[in-house]
Every structure is written in structure tokens, then in C-alpha cells.
């Protein structure tokens, strides 16, 4: 496994690396891990997150927001064949290891743990691990798809209306492009597939998609906090 240990990049370094990055054939792709020590707590962003989702304390899923910048830092150095714009986030799982205090500094380790070709495109798996005082606190595992332009779904489009289905709806939220831009500024995720229907179509999608993590944060925020009190995995 290729191992990198670095400081957090500046915005100018990110831009430079993004402009000069070259995609590599999948044969050269290898598991890669990036460790960034002493990541300072961002109290302004912490507060903005709580205000956006109406939380009294940060949700476990905030670990994704904290690690997102370093996921980008890893992707810009990993030898992968994919463009970074247009990657589709499929799933995210959070595992509690020990107590994490988001108001304190931490170390972040991000790893490209796996990759494979599929009928839909290239699937990547990533794991983000947070540490405080040398102790592992939270793990976040994510699946990401680089969708093949040649892939066509075999599933017939549903003609039903989800509102007619038998769901126990506890909350609803209208989601707009303004919502997507607001979350992009909060999280740093400016993937074009979320921000306008034209940029989404240019990347092979029929329309813009709200960030999947926005849906997760908002859904968790609607739950009774006692349901998250003794959580082990989400």
C-alpha cells in the first residue's frame, strides 16, 4: 500500500494539483492512504452545520464533512483513471469506536481501500478514520461510482408516485438548487452534478442531484436524539 503523510493543503495547492493532475490507467491504481495530523477544529463550520440542520450537537455524519477535504487531497494523488468531477457518492457508513469531540483538534486518515470495474463503471471504496490523542474514534466508509457513459439501466421507470406508497412520513423538506449551493459552501463539495441541471447533464446525468450526504444529515437530524445516543453504526 502506498502511504502518504502530509499537512492539509492550501486552496492554491488544491487548484494547482487539480490543474496538473493526470489520469492513470486502472492497471496502475493501487491502494493508497493519506494521514493528516493535527487538523484544527473549525468552530465556524461546526456552528453553521448545526444551524443548517437544526441540531444542538454535531451529528455522527459530520465526520464526512470533516474528512471530505482530505478525501479530495487523496484523490488528487491516487493513480486512478477517473475524472474527479462527476463521481457519484453511493453509500456512507459510520462506525463508533470511541468518543469524539468535534470541538477539539484531531488526526485524519483517508484510504482508498478498493476499486473494481463493474457494469455501471468503476466502483471505489474509501475509509476515513478520525483519531484524538492517538485513539481511534470514528470510522466512515464510502462507496463512490465513476459511471460509465455506456451504461444504461435495465429497470423500467416507475410510473407510481412515492407519496401514494405506504410510508410512515415523519418529516418533509423541499430541496432546491439553493439548498445544494448552501450545502456545497458548508461542506466544500462543489461537484457539478449537484449545482445545476446543465452541468449534471454534461456529466451524463438527466438532472442535478442533491448531495446524498445532505439527505443523510437532514434525516438523522429529524430523529429523536435518544435514538442516536447509543449508536454503534449508521
Where are these regions (language model features)?
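Hydrophobic beta-sheet segments that form the core/acyl-binding groove
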Residues: 87-134, 227-234
Amino acid at each position: 500500500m502506498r502511504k502518504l503523510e502530509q499537512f492539509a493543503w492550501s486552496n492554491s495547492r488544491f487548484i494547482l494539483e487539480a490543474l496538473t493532475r493526470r489520469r492513470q490507467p486502472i492497471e496502475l491504481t493501487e491502494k493508497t492512504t493519506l494521514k493528516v495530523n493535527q487538523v484544527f477544529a473549525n468552530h465556524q463550520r461546526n456552528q453553521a452545520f448545526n444551524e443548517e440542520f437544526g441540531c444542538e450537537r454535531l451529528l455522527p455524519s459530520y465526520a464526512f464533512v470533516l474528512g471530505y477535504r482530505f478525501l479530495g487531497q487523496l484523490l488528487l494523488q491516487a493513480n486512478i483513471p477517473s475524472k474527479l468531477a462527476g463521481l457519484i457518492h453511493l453509500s456512507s457508513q459510520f462506525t463508533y469506536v470511541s468518543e469524539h469531540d468535534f470541538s477539539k483538534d484531531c488526526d485524519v486518515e483517508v484510504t482508498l481501500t478498493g476499486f473494481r470495474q463493474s457494469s455501471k463503471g468503476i466502483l471505489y471504496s474509501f475509509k476515513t478514520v478520525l483519531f484524538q490523542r492517538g485513539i481511534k474514534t470514528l470510522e466512515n466508509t464510502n462507496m463512490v461510482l465513476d459511471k460509465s457513459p455506456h451504461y444504461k439501466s435495465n429497470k423500467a421507470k416507475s410510473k407510481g408516485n412515492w407519496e401514494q406508497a405506504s410510508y410512515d412520513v415523519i418529516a418533509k423538506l423541499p430541496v432546491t438548487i439553493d439548498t445544494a449551493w448552501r450545502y456545497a459552501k458548508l461542506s466544500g463539495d462543489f461537484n457539478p452534478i449537484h449545482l445545476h441541471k446543465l452541468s449534471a447533464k454534461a456529466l451524463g446525468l438527466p438532472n442535478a442531484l442533491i448531495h446524498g450526504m445532505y439527505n443523510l444529515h437532514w434525516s438523522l437530524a429529524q430523529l429523536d436524539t435518544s435514538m442516536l445516543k447509543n449508536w454503534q453504526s449508521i
